[in-house]
Amino acid sequence: MSSFLSGLYNEARNAAGGVKDFATGIVSPSLRIGVTGLSRSGKTVFITSVVHALLHGGKLPLFTALTQGRINRVYLEPQPDDDVPRFAYEKHVESLTGDARHWPESTNRLSQLRLTIEYEATGLVARNLQGSKLHVDIIDYPGEWLLDLPLMSQTYAEWSAATLKASEREPRKTLAKQWLAHIGTLDPAAPADEAQAQKAAKLFTDYLASCRADDVSLSTLPPGRFLMPGDLAGSPLLTFAPLALDPATKSADGSLHAMMERRYDAYVSRVVEPFFYNHFARLDRQIVLVDTLSALNAGAEAVKDLKTALTDVLGC
């Protein structure tokens, strides 16, 4: 299926799902809130602390309904999406409050938690149409996935050019030396070579990991799954890398260029687009946590890169 037809199909499916959600929401309203942020930004602790405060009557001065005394009851319920892992709320509470206290593990996959709030509605219309119960579905996912969304509007050639151009500036330039040296030995028009593709992908992944290190703290590091591969580790979907391409030259069948381009396109269509249409596009609200202190500590280039990452995401 072409990307155009695939996009039309996904848009139609989302529209149908939206009608269904609207019809269901009249009887039992729900609010889907996405929570994300780059690694070590505090997503897990944030979600756990907010849910704990709601369940146990903690102080949330900006939650107007709570400060007005209109919240009658808050409790957890089974989540609506059976194919999504549950956010391990109880495990994280134990990590933070148990005898052997430690920080919870970082987010490395998408998870969900449903919180139901029974409240006293204000106004006759609101009370009759919406009742006094709201389901809040919290969707937790790695911020690295969010940074992949701009890839939906970039071709392989455009992404390669942008990535290589970014590597010309410090601190990326120093960190990219080994990867760029290998890229310089590759002929995009040469026959496809799996060993060369694997080596290029490995060196590119090492470069991205170095850019994310605490002393550098760069943020614009797509593709996100290269740093959080999960069950995709070692698959062709993650075995590609940018190439130095002639803008006027198209990929020839059977070439290294064609192999890399095909795998990039597959990554976008099989990883990025499903996340966008199945999860991101269905969110009603989005919370993005930003670790500005790490960027400030790493220097001006890290702050500039963080701004670029946020600008790219907000443009999606």
Model features per residue range: what roles?
Residues 35:
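Hydrophobic anchor at the beta1->P-loop junction of P-loop NTPases
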Residues 31:
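Nucleotide donor/acceptor-binding cores
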